[in-house]
């Protein structure tokens, strides 16, 4: 596990984008695992900028998102389909057929979960998975207590997670109670994991990830066992972690 400290959110986002850009350039058919929320927005802005400057193309890129709310149509402004179009896909040359997100309005959610796993495997697996971390240690929508053996599944959202996401909705009552999420085993199959952490409000969770015990009660702790994890975090998020943990390079 490498930890790279940056000065602030902006430098975290830029460094993350440089790493993703290098990955895209190195591979013939790169497969990216993508996340939503406020943390990766800066990363996506830098990727769009690189595309507009003709530094990269997404023509051969395939993407798989971590999760989607159950019950929200892809055109709903709070769906993750909508988020990804708004913050990345509408601004680059990625073919529509290469974009994959769970279908939160599928008639049979169990079949959708199995199908999503199959699509990831058919694409050859994920080369680099972008992650954030929740204050309770969730990754994707895998809440505390989720089995480390879990694959893509439907999850009941923890109240703390719904409260954290309420800022994106008109009220807490509009936040869905369920989501489809890649499971922890699904995430761990990625060849590389890129965890982005920013802000003092994530410091306690990040310290627990780095120094705590591996436990299903803190899902992100499983990342300690992955062979290729890079954490890019700003100073505020790293305030509880001693400097000797840090790496100078990617």
From Swiss-Prot:
Keyword Hydrolase: yes
A GO term, aspect molecular function: glucosamine-6-phosphate deaminase activity
GO CC terms in record: cytoplasm
One Pfam family named in its UniProt record: Glucosamine_iso
Pathway terms, separated by semicolons: Amino-sugar metabolism; N-acetylneuraminate degradation; D-fructose 6-phosphate from N-acetylneuraminate: step 5/5
Catalytic activity, EC: 3.5.99.6
Keyword flag Cell division: no
Highest taxon of source: Bacteria
Keywords: Carbohydrate metabolism, Hydrolase
Catalytic residues identified in the record: 67 (proton acceptor), 136 (for ring-opening step), 138 (proton acceptor), 143 (for ring-opening step)
GO BP terms: carbohydrate metabolic process; glucosamine catabolic process; N-acetylglucosamine catabolic process; N-acetylneuraminate catabolic process
UniProt catalytic activity: alpha-D-glucosamine 6-phosphate + H2O = beta-D-fructose 6-phosphate + NH4(+)
Function (record text): Catalyzes the reversible isomerization-deamination of glucosamine 6-phosphate (GlcN6P) to form fructose 6-phosphate (Fru6P) and ammonium ion.
UniProt xrefs under NCBIfam families: nagB
Similarity annotation: Belongs to the glucosamine/galactosamine-6-phosphate isomerase family. NagB subfamily.
Protein name in the entry: Glucosamine-6-phosphate deaminase
């Amino acid at each position: 596990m490498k930890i790279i400290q940056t000065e602030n959110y902006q430098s975290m986002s830029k460094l993350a984008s440089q790493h993703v850009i290098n990955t895209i350039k190195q591979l013939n058919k790169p497969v990216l695992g993508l996340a939503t929320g406020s943390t990766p927005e800066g990363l996506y802005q830098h990727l769009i900028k690189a595309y507009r400057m003709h530094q990269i193309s997404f023509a051969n890129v395939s993407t798989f998102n971590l999760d989607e709310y159950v019950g929200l149509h892809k055109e709903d402004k709070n769906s993750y389909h909508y988020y990804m179009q708004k913050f990345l896909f509408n601004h680059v040359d990625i073919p529509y057929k290469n974009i994959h997100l769970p279908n939160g309005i599928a008639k049979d959610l169990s079949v959708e979960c199995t199908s999503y796993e199959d699509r990831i495997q058919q694409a050859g697996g994920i080369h680099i998975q972008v992650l954030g971390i929740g204050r309770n240690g969730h990754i994707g929508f895998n809440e505390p207590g989720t089995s480390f053996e879990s694959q893509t599944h439907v999850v009941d959202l923890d109240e703390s997670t719904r409260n954290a996401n309420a800022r994106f909705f008109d009220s807490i009552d509009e936040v869905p109670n369920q989501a489809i999420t890649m499971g922890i085993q699904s995430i761990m199959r990625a060849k590389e994991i890129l965890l982005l952490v920013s802000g003092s409000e994530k410091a306690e969770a990040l310290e627990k990830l780095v120094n705590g015990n591996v436990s299903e009660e803190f899902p992100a702790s499983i990342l300690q066992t992955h062979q290729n994890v890079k954490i890019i975090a700003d100073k505020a998020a790293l305030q509880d972690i001693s400097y000797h943990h840090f790496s100078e390079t990617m």
